[in-house]
Amino acid sequence: MPRKGPAPKRPLINDPVYGSPLVTQLVNKILLDGKKSTAERIVYGALEQAREKTGTDPVVTLKRALDNVKPSLEVKPRRVGGATYQVPVEVRPGRANTLALRWLVNFARARREKTMVERLANELLDASNGLGASVKRREDTHKMAESNRAFAHYRW
């Protein structure tokens, strides 16, 4: 365990094309093997496709998709007297954002379209319309928290 305490949070640099820190976060989530230019090409291509299909600002589409995917509750395992309970807890805003981006990227990778640009664009559009696997994941998370509501008093 480090003795200095937690590392300070570094501020996110705004993305050079859209001027949004959300786009920077998305690029960093797509990033594999340090290939940032490839990740940027994928994200910018997907946002451009989203602009062509909707005719609106792609950053607005991204924000709407994130709002539809962000969980407000999740379950955390808590051990009490030999039994492990799934305790529902509220999700902090930063974690909700991170989870939403992670789910969007993972479910985009699992899609069947030919290129990653198409997959990400379609997942973003589906999520912004309240459809898609990432929105279903959020609903499942909320359902799990709701069904374990009886253990909410074990929160810490």
UniProtKB/Swiss-Prot annotation:
GO terms for cellular component: small ribosomal subunit. PROSITE patterns: RIBOSOMAL_S7. Keywords: Ribonucleoprotein, Ribosomal protein, RNA-binding, rRNA-binding, tRNA-binding. One of its GO terms (molecular function) is rRNA binding. The keyword Zinc does not apply. InterPro entries: Ribosomal_uS7, Ribosomal_uS7_bac/org-type, Ribosomal_uS7_CS, Ribosomal_uS7_dom, Ribosomal_uS7_dom_sf. GO terms for biological process: translation. Transmembrane segments: none annotated. CDD domains: uS7_Bacteria (cd14869). Pfam families: Ribosomal_S7 (PF00177). Part of the 30S ribosomal subunit. Contacts proteins S9 and S11. Belongs to the universal ribosomal protein uS7 family. One of the primary rRNA binding proteins, it binds directly to 16S rRNA where it nucleates assembly of the head domain of the 30S subunit. Is located at the subunit interface close to the decoding center, probably blocks exit of the E-site tRNA. NCBIfam families: rpsG_bact. This is Small ribosomal subunit protein uS7. It comes from Nocardia farcinica (strain IFM 10152).
